[in-house]
């Protein structure tokens, strides 16, 4: 079986905006993803949502409608309790065990990675693509900066085997 390249793009999407859709469209032009799963958080532990889960889910469905290779994954919206990335990553890795999974996140989220639940395990089981976000520079002396220095690759092919790399 030929493995697929699957991106996972999670967030609160409160609200979803043009920046979110532009990032995905740009990634699809640059990287040969077979699919990108957009996953709205159900109960994000780092943020308080203003809109209801149903409203955010509807916004995400509308924003990404018609973009090839995009699927909206509702698993976190329907999960009880906090939405931890490690749980979702484990589920996706089990479901798509023959495929290459890349977790997509903004530099703002990655700069706080060491505050995430089971963050070290998360970093060790999945490859991450960090998207630069205006006004959110990663301090090279922070934990996130250190992780980038230790795990960074500039070659997408490096993500086709193993885990724990950062692009």
Predicted regions and their residues:
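Nucleotidyltransferase catalytic core that binds NTPs
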Residues: 1-167
């Amino acid at each position: 079986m030929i493995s697929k390249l699957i991106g996972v793009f999670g967030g609160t999407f409160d609200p979803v905006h043009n920046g979110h859709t532009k990032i995905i469209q740009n990634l699809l032009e640059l990287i040969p993803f077979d699919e990108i799963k957009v996953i709205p958080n159900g109960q994000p532990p780092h943020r308080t949502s203003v809109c209801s889960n149903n409203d955010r889910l509807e916004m995400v469905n509308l924003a990404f409608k018609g973009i090839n290779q995009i699927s909206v994954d509702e698993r976190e919206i329907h999960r009880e309790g906090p939405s931890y990335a490690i749980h979702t990553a484990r589920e996706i890795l089990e479901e798509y065990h023959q495929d290459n999974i890349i977790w997509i996140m903004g530099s703002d989220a990655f700069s706080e990675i060491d505050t995430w639940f089971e963050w070290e395990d998360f970093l060790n089981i999945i490859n991450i693509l960090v998207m630069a976000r205006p006004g959110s520079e990663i301090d090279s002396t922070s934990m996130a900066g250190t992780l980038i220095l230790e795990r960074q690759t500039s070659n997408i092919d490096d993500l086709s085997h193993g885990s724990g790399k950062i692009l």
